[in-house]
Amino acid sequence: MTKPIVAIVGKPNVGKSTIFNRVVGERISIVEDTPGVTRDRIYSSGEWLTHEFNIIDTGGIEIGDAPFQTQIRAQAEIAIEEADVIIFMVNVREGLTQSDEMVAQMLYKSKKPVVLAVNKVDNLEMRNDIYDFYSLGFGDPYPISGSHGLGLGDLLDAVVENFNKESEDPYDEDTIRLSIIGRPNVGKSSLVNAILGEERVIVSNVAGTTRDAIDTEYSYDGQDYVLIDTAGMRKKGKVYESTEKYSVLRALKAIERSEVVLVVIDAEQGIIEQDKRVAGYAHEEGKAIVIVVNKWDTVEKDSKTMKKFTDDVRNEFQFLDYAQIAFVSAKEGLRLKTLFPYINQASENHKKRVQSSTLNEVVTDAISMNPTPTDKGRRLNVFYTTQVAIEPPTFVVFVNDVELMHFSYRRYLENQIRNAFGFEGTPIHIIPRKRN
């Protein structure tokens, strides 16, 4: 299921970031256990009344044609385009301004649900000053105080009321849902076209469950696939591509609806920080992943080139040590057939279940080879392990004290489970839980 996207927009200094932080709370904290995943995002997850959503902060929009302002306005337009609901924030202390009216004009054109939030209403007397904002034409303004947290519940009530009910997944459970992600200009569109080209049977273009996404169904070697949001991957435009933090919103929607994600990198340019950031989105969503090294035809090669590049990928993507690596040239159509066994294996392992008896034998043997750690004289005791979920495979380990299960030992158990059962292409989650 795809989480709705909520965008906070408005002129500078109306308190957008304060409200953003209020909504996401502690969800923006850094997870230390995941090396290599950069976290300088302007979006995070929020939840209200059992509704989960992604929320994004945008730069302040002002009147003017300075290059910096032009870029901020372009970024905000992208955020508005990708959002399902928009929080339009204004500042009661400044009153209604030309910048507010300019933002309102942008929002009229979007035809998206807009919830008007009047910030910095820090006391009851200031509520009398919100009525000027009715003229913006977005219905009742919601008075809030970001600094004090006042009125936030009513605001979020209005936001979630605008969420559309999710459509059911229209695809058969045996159909592999696939998305292609990567930073700009790594050849995503070329890979889409190559996959859908010769020897592939395109079944149909169907509307996806996400607004204005087009999914493409196709078959290869007896297996059905659906490529999520081919329209989004083919989308062009320098402004859209240059604003990476905002254009990633569409990729997030595709990732959430996917089972297997192809992370595309450029063999010619090598691996940069942005590649790791893009891959991190899919990893954190628990998706099966195949790393695709594209433009392999542009690299001068000898007998050791592929081994060296593989080592570089493993070093840079340490958090994706489970992902298979495919070397292809989408433009030339080279080595594309190597992709599909990796995709199929990743999908199969993403849904794999293992027997509890065999699983516990593996864990017992692992503990015999490497005894559980101690801390201040107390030893970690592992009582029982069971698989509780698939997509991704998730295991609960019942222990005497969760604090004694350090990350390094959890990773050790994960590696032993992988060695025993495979799980190539998919993350697996190990969750320690105190036995009652």
Curated annotation (Swiss-Prot):
CDD domains: EngA1, EngA2. GTP 2 binds at residues 182-189, 229-233, 294-297. GTPase that plays an essential role in the late steps of ribosome biogenesis. GTP 1 binds at residues 10-17, 57-61, 119-122. This is GTPase Der. Keywords: GTP-binding, Nucleotide-binding, Repeat, Ribosome biogenesis. It comes from the Bacteria. Associates with the 50S ribosomal subunit. GO terms for biological process: ribosome biogenesis. Residues 352-436 form the KH-like domain. Belongs to the TRAFAC class TrmE-Era-EngA-EngB-Septin-like GTPase superfamily. EngA (Der) GTPase family. InterPro entries: G_ENGA, GTP-bd, GTPase_Der, KH_dom-like, KH_dom-like_a/b, P-loop_NTPase, Small_GTP-bd. NCBIfam families: GTPase_EngA, small_GTP. The lineage of its organism: Bacteria, Bacillati, Bacillota, Bacilli, Bacillales. GO terms for molecular function: GTP binding; ribosome binding. Pfam families: KH_dom-like (PF14714), MMR_HSR1 (PF01926). Residues 4-167, 176-351 form the EngA-type G domain. The gene is der.
